[in-house]
Amino acid sequence: MRCRERWTEMERSSGILMPIFSLPSPYGVGTFGAAAYEFADFLHAAGQRYWQLLPLGPTGCGDSPYQSFSAHAGNPYFIDPDLLIREGLLTAEEAAASAWGENPRHVDYGKIYENRFALLARAKARGWERDRAAISDFETENGGWLPDYALFMALKQHFDMKPWTQWPDEGAQRHEALSLSHWRAELREDVELFTYIQFLFFRQWDALKKYINGLGISVIGDIPVYVAMDSADVWAEP
């Protein structure tokens, strides 16, 4: 009886499933930019109360949102270049110079992978020192996963994106402290880049989510059922 009473007290409402990557964008894949805010406005105008998303994590080699390099990190592809231009981290010419794919109905993940990280590296070159205090706070708040994730991605990049079980350095494979200390120093620039990318991701996502919630719309998230074998989570907890 109590359960029935609780159900009758719930307000009937509806929403729409719209993955971030499906939003229109001049950058090859949907982002947290203008189209996301416009979709939130559309939901509000249509009387919808929920925006359902697919997982927001960084996709692995199969580009599936359900196979992610991290259960905690965000997908770098969703960082909007136009917002970075507005912050002074990129120029419009830099954002327009890269090829993002020619078919607006299909995501060319190959081109995005080739070009997105180079663009974000430009943003990091301008913003790392400028944002240092905020980055330090971000690192402290996310200390349980961010250091391992940033080093994991730097190592994957260094070892040609091979699964961590195939890395030629056995110490790095086994997450041994001495090896990790060596690689953290050796790959410092890349570790900083992957740290800064997460800083940018969550800054843009937090702003978008605040806007969505301000319209009276709730976000229904999603996560993979299991962590992926080739992920920072499994690597860091062997």
What is each residue range found by the language model?
Residues 1-9:
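Short, Lys/Arg-enriched N-terminal segments with co-localized hydrophobic residues
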Residues 11-238:
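Acidic/aromatic-lined carbohydrate-recognition and catalytic surfaces
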